[in-house]
């Protein structure tokens, strides 16, 4: 585990974004942990979050030309990541996002910000079913000269859907692009094992991983 990954997990726990207990997911599964990126809801938290996304980009080495934040949650994520890349990695890159509904007046269209062209890195919080990413892929495919370079998310739950694959593995298979994350469940487990206060949650998370993991 990289230092920035350990720092991110601690940061997520401190902000109440990553919690341990008993949570019912939309899928109906009872999960021993829950991740709610909507709680990165202050200026300081968003700035720190951008630095973690930027660190994951630097670590991945994925080449790309533009950052894309899917509406709505991806918009501030792409913005703060672009700021962090410029301020901490000396990479001043364009970024853009989509509207849920296209405007008929003013600047018009469904895309806002830099032109969506070249290799596109999609920024989001998590991939649950993959539906949102599939919609984004259609948007990118509709733009001349644009193609997806990859997807970056905060947490990879490493959890299968209804079949044998996770939603992330299905996206990688169907579109031939990498999906990278700041951290995965593997690193969360490693963090729990090393933390005296949180170690009590390790057996439940390991059992969940054994049942639903990929």
Swiss-Prot record:
EC number: 2.4.2.10
Positions annotated to bind 5-phospho-alpha-D-ribose 1-diphosphate: 26, 72-73, 99-100, 103, 105, 124-132
Superkingdom of the organism of origin: Bacteria
Protein transport among keywords: no
UniProt xrefs under InterPro entries: OPRT, Or_phspho_trans_dom, PRibTrfase_dom, PRTase-like
Subunit structure, as described in the record: Homodimer.
The protein's name in its UniProt record: Orotate phosphoribosyltransferase
Organism per entry: Pseudomonas fluorescens (strain Pf0-1)
Gene designation: pyrE
